[in-house]
A protein has these predicted regions:
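Juxtamembrane helix-loop boundary signature in multi-pass membrane transporters
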Residues: 1-11, 111-171, 178
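Membrane-interface interhelical linkers
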Residues: 1-20, 25-30, 35-81, 87-97, ...
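Helix-coil boundary and interhelical linker segments in multi-pass alpha-helical membrane proteins
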Residues: 1-2, 50-60, 70-71, 116-129, ...
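Short helix-kink/termination motifs in transmembrane helices of multi-pass secondary transporters
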Residues: 14-19, 84-89, 115, 168-179, ...
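Active-site phosphate/pyrophosphate-handling residues
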Residues: 22, 100, 179, 187
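Specific alpha-helical transmembrane segments that line the substrate/conduction pathway
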Residues: 79-83, 94-143, 188-199
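Alpha-helix initiation and capping sites
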Residues: 158, 170, 174, 186-189, ...
Length: 236
């Protein structure tokens, strides 16, 4: 069952990338990202409110969001910054690169998590995992070769660097999740980190995008922006 859910999550993330690419086409990046965080937080907000004011409704279910203090929330805020950093790099990179390049680079993220788990948590990889790591390295090399045929130089293209940084930050988030999940409720983390991202994005929008909005790519509404949030939350 868990393996089936993992495959379903991967499929949903595939649609998430497609909707994200369509939303970013000829569009302003930061407003799209802000709306994604806003809609994602609105999806989880009812669970937070019901758990706080009518705890008996969701109590004992997987949708229950425990009420905790700042001593716990501060760890979730850190996760919000890590994830948002990954998204900012990833959104800018995806806007300027084809999905055929972005997808395979993002696919190396689980390998980074494996290596990080080995270095940080002292875990040991089995033979099949080592084979997977080596295949990922070879695939990345072959991808850089094929990218040159499309006019994309991996060494001198800043958008490639952005996607790589997004993957690294995503791997760091995955490792941090492993640390958090040992002591915190998954729904607690999932719900509140989306909410905190909205508050983090507000000054970014007001200070970095809004004053210069007329000098850059204009923002246009696209219904696929809502689909980004829906498919991401479902995958998570």
């Amino acid at each position: 069952m868990w393996l089936l859910l993992a495959f379903l999550s991967a499929a949903l993330l595939g649609f998430y990338d497609v909707f994200k690419k369509k939303s970013l086409r000829d569009n302003a990046v930061l407003p799209v990202l802000f709306l994604n965080t806003l809609f994602s937080s609105l999806i989880f907000l009812p669970f937070i409110l019901v758990s706080a004011f009518a705890p008996s409704v969701l109590g004992g279910t997987m949708f229950d969001v425990p009420v905790v203090g700042w001593e716990v929330h501060k760890f979730i805020v850190v996760k919000s910054f890590i994830v948002l950093s990954s998204w900012i790099f990833g959104y800018f990179g995806m806007k300027h690169l084809p999905l055929t390049i972005v997808g395979p680079i993002n696919a190396t993220r689980p390998v980074m998590v494996l290596v990080g788990a080995m270095l940080v948590f002292g875990e040991r990889l089995n033979l099949y995992q080592w084979i997977g790591v080596m295949l990922a390295i070879v695939s990345f090399f072959m991808l850089s070769r094929s990218g040159k045929k499309e006019g994309i130089d991996f060494k001198h293209n800043k958008w490639i660097l952005f996607i790589v940084l997004a993957a690294v930050a995503g791997a760091v988030s995955g490792l941090y999740d492993k640390y958090l999940m040992k002591q915190l409720n998954p729904m607690l983390v999932q719900s509140w980190y989306n909410v905190y991202q909205v508050f983090i994005m507000c000054p970014i929008i007001l200070l970095l995008w809004y004053p210069k909005r007329k000098e850059s790519t204009p923002f246009r509404w696209d219904w696929t922006i809502i689909c980004i949030s829906i498919f991401l939350c479902a995958a998570d």
